[in-house]
């Protein structure tokens, strides 16, 4: 009897992949579920971005394989993005690598730096893909705690007490998902010092810095960060392009070359039209477009999400940023999944239970802001009917 590889038994199907099947079944039964669970922007990219894609797609010479390193136009635009938003200088030819989405980049970075058995630090709570990929690759996972009473920042005193002799990578994610916590400049400085002291590569995942955030930051702003850090960024959230699969990593020339060596043996560059349109998106993202799409629209939706949290008697930090709202459930609920299942089946609204992000999320729920205002208002009214009766 044919059996799958051992690594398949080490992981589970992604929570949202499983849960969306259930939601689809409920919708097929006429339940009309409103999903406030996934962070997939529902707004379109700019018109200029779409026009550029169509223009290139109509060019009969634009449909061949593209270089894995990415076309110069895209890498130059990505370097310009870092200069504009973070005032960080990057060499577009050697310090930027385009990705076909951040998920594949997590795989490529881990392959480039870790042998089986090497140790990796992963935040709890944190993005589940960090854990899944390291399970697939056979690294040793060590979780470090993020806690609300510490502003969801790393506890460096606790980290220093660990045996770090076999740690190769440390994953961080600021602005944080799922908590919305924002790294202070001091946090980034401590991370760089920690990496230098222990010969660890810190990988900061930074796709949310432009969402509901008036002061975008990058770990690359810290002197010396480029020598010991890698940063992910993405157009999925900031430019409303999740399905386009356009992301990037920035670091020093050597680290980028190692990652490119892995990546070049796995895939090619994405369609030329996507690369040129992504470059156009970064170039035409005016302050007005950014403020309307990444601040004002999400601010209205955030107000509605806060009302939902209040109906559920959940506590939340009003200073969190990003496209989610993270809230702590009250003690009257024994289990967060019982609560989200009640909301799903009685209010017909799909919210995310925090336990999927780690044990430190088991008393929390997450509301996505990626739904039209009208849908969010309907979701609020449905939840009121169930929980205020």
Indicate residue ranges for each PLM-predicted region.
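Intrinsically disordered, tyrosine-centered linear signaling motifs in cytosolic regions
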Residues: 64-65, 208
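PLP-dependent class I/II
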Residues: 2-4, 9-14, 19, 23-34, ...
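Conserved N-terminal alpha-helix of the aminotransferase class I/II PLP-enzyme fold
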Residues: 65-100
């Amino acid at each position: 009897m044919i059996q799958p590889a051992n690594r398949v038994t080490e992981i589970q199907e992604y929570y949202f992949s499983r849960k969306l099947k259930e939601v689809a079944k409920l919708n097929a039964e006429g339940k009309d579920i409103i999903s406030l669970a996934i962070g997939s922007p529902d707004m379109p990219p700019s018109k200029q971005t779409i026009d550029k894609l169509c223009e290139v797609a109509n060019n009969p010479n634009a449909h061949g394989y593209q270089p894995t390193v990415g076309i110069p136009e895209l890498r130059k635009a990505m370097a310009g993005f870092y200069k504009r938003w973070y005032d960080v200088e990057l060499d577009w030819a050697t310090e930027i690598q385009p990705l076909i989405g951040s998920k594949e980049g997590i795989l490529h970075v881990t392959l480039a730096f870790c042998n089986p058995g090497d140790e990796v630090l992963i935040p709890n709570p944190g993005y589940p893909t960090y854990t899944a990929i390291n399970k697939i690759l056979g690294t040793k996972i060590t979780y470090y705690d993020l806690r609300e009473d510490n502003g969801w920042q790393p506890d460096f005193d606790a980290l220093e007490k660990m045996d770090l002799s076999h740690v190769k990578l440390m994953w961080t994610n600021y602005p944080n998902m799922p908590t919305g916590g924002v790294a202070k400049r001091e946090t980034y400085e401590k991370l760089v010092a920690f990496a230098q002291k222990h010969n660890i590569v810190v990988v900061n995942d930074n796709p949310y810095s432009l969402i509901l955030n008036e002061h975008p930051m990058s770990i690359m702003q810290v002197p010396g960060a480029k020598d010991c850090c890698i940063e992910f960024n993405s157009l999925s959230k900031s430019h409303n392009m999740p399905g386009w699969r356009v992301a990037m990593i920035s670091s020093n020339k050597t680290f980028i070359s190692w990652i490119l060596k892995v990546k070049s043996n796995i895939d090619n560059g994405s369609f030329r039209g996507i690369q040129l349109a992504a470059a156009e998106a970064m170039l035409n993202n005016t302050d007005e477009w950014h403020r309307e799409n990444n601040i004002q629209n999400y601010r209205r939706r955030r107000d509605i999400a806060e009302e939902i949290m209040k109906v559920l008697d959940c506590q939340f930090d009003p200073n969190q940023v990003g496209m989610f709202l993270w809230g702590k459930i009250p003690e009257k609920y024994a289990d967060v999944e019982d609560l989200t299942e009640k909301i799903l089946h009685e209010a017909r609204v799909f919210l995310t239970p925090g336990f999927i992000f780690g044990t430190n999320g088991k008393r929390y729920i997450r509301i996505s802001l990626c739904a039209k205002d009208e849908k969010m208002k309907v979701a609020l009214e449905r939840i009121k009917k169930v929980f205020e009766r």
